[in-house]
Amino acid sequence: MDEIPMPRVHILATGGTIAGSGASSVDPGYRSGVMGVSALVDGVVGLRSVAVLTGEQFSQVGSQDMNDGLWLSLAARVNALFAADEADGIVITHGTDTAEETGFFLHLVVKSDRPVVLTGSMRPASSLSPDGPLNLFNAVSVASDPGARDRGVIVALNDDLHSARDVTKSSTTDVQAFISPGAGLLGTASYGRIRYFRSPTHPHTSGSEFSVEGLVAMPRVDILYAHANMPADLVRASASLGAQGIVIAGMGNGNVSTDVANTLADVAGKGVIVVRSSRVSSGDVGRNIELDDDGFGFVASDQLNPQKSRVLLQLCLASGLGSGPIQDAFFRY
């Protein structure tokens, strides 16, 4: 009987806390991304028994320094690895600050049903009790699992599996720092033992209309945080500095003051796409609820938080969509 070959998993290391190091095992301060991919792999006992591993140091940054250029390069690399059949699954080690944004971007532009799994850690590798090694073990296990196919990009942290569409960071320091409000977990992974609870219900990866092939830059989209007595001149400043889109992290159901709403309507009339999201951690932003989106020319974000709304709006603008199709996209994705 022929032996079943081990799955091939390629690790793309981008830096982050999982590769961080501090002055001592109990020092809360540390530098992100100082460990290389080989040290990360060698630090996880039994990892090479899960899959045939290859790895590369894609970048060495804290995820606060992730940017559009790195996203485009990362998407191109993932798509190239799959197109060349060089991996059955890919793990991306990443800082937690912007993991949800990188994950959602890849969720919309990777053109394969093979698993892409983001992981990271809340504690640096030098910590007294680092969470990174087990997170990496679980992530490689998921990337090796045929059951992970066609579930889009998965974020694997602290034994939980999240869809990149739904996940958000909810704590600055807790090890249990990520939640998927409303939608809930995709599943769990405990010491490599995987259970799935559901599959994503919105289009993703090979089912997504979005592609960044040949794209060298992303449109500028700004996020403005709404608050009591918010000055409307922030809207004018954003538009004057070249933003093609503005996402409002609105109060409640995506609300803003009358003055801000009128100013947003003015820039929307001049071609800037305005998306209303919410600074609240869960719930939908409905269209034409308290604000007249039809009259103002706004887009309602539906279920996407401000940072995810920015990603989708960038891709919509890069695809040349107008406000009507962009609203449709927010309802679909």
PLM region descriptions:
Residues L12-T14, I92-H94, V117-G120, I154-N158, ...:
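Short beta-strand segments
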Residues I92-R114, V256-A265:
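Short Gly/Thr/Asp-enriched flexible loops that form oxyanion-binding sites at enzyme active sites
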Residues L118-Y191:
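Internal gly/pro-rich beta-alpha loop/helix module
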Residues A87, S112-P115, G269-I273:
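A short helix->loop->beta-strand "cap" motif at the edges of active sites that frequently abuts
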Residues M1-L81, N262:
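ATP/NTP phosphate-donor binding region
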Residues N253-Y333:
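C-terminal non-catalytic interaction/assembly regions of soluble proteins
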Residues P5-R8, L12-G16, G36-R48, S163-G245, ...:
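Accessory alpha-helical/coil subdomains and C-terminal extensions
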Residues A84-A99, L241-N253:
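Short acidic, glycine-rich surface-loop motifs adjacent to enzyme active sites
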